[in-house]
């Protein structure tokens, strides 16, 4: 059996983790033997008083009132860790999501300080830039270029985007492009500030 992969995405109150923005949704989809399984992880999260920015509201269609009864990250952290532990996380613009998840782990006082201590990370944005230099490589543009269909992305959602990303990853690594993707798992997500990453998220 091949290594367990998890396509992963978050939605957040805004772009600036260093300014107190929080995760409001987590979505994850399991991939085994190059096929999506029915195993998924999805939850909305209460951002503990951090207001959702207008930009995030427009993108996600999530309002502050929608999250009043949602669990806190600390209440689901063990379930989340158990779902992803030991996997390779497939993330588009990984530095953004890794920064936010690590912040949530810190605030929850988790024993896991860095998600990369229990998972490896494959950044599809880095790979896409190698495959399609000089082109738009956000998830919308990339999935359209690779003819990923069957999804309504009028609004962003973490689980929806994780499903789209899983299909996109499988297409990217399907052998149709002459590129050694196994050697292109570039961990460059620390080179860009989250405030510069909006165009890569949309």
Task: Give each language-model segment a name.
Residues 174-188:
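Mixed-charge, glycine-rich, non-catalytic linkers/tails in nucleic-acid processing enzymes
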Residues 189-196:
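Conserved small/polar residues in nucleotide/adenosyl-binding loops
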Residues 126-129, 144, 167-170:
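Generic alpha-helical structural context detector
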Residues 157-169:
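Acidic, divalent-metal-coordinating active-site segment for phosphoryl/phosphodiester hydrolysis
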Residues 1-118, 129, 141-145, 149-155:
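Conserved non-catalytic scaffold segment of RNase H-like nuclease domains
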Residues 121-134:
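Short alpha-helix plus adjacent loop in nuclease-associated cores
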Residues 200-202:
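Hydrophobic alpha-helical segments, chiefly the membrane-spanning helices
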Residues 105, 166-173:
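Amphipathic alpha-helical interface segments used for dimerization/assembly
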């Amino acid at each position: 059996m091949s290594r367990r992969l998890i396509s992963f995405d978050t939605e957040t109150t805004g772009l600036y983790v260093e300014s107190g923005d929080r995760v409001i949704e987590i979505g994850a989809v399991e991939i085994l033997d190059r096929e999506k399984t029915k195993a998924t992880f999805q939850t909305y999260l209460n951002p503990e008083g951090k207001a959702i920015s207008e930009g995030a509201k427009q993108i996600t269609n999530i309002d502050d009132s929608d999250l009043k009864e949602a669990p806190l990250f600390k209440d689901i952290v063990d379930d989340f860790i158990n779902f992803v532990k030991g996997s390779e996380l497939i993330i588009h613009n990984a530095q953004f999501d890794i920064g936010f998840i690590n912040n949530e782990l810190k605030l929850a006082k988790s024993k896991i300080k860095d998600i990369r201590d229990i998972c490896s990370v494959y950044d599809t944005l880095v790979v896409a830039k190698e495959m399609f230099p000089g082109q738009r490589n956000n998830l919308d543009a990339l999935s359209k270029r690779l003819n990923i269909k069957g999804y309504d992305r009028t609004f962003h959602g973490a689980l929806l985007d994780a499903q789209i990303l899983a299909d996109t990853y499988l297409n990217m690594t399907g052998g149709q492009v002459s590129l050694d993707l196994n050697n292109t798992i570039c961990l460059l997500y620390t080179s860009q500030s989250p405030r510069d990453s909006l165009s890569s998220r949309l």
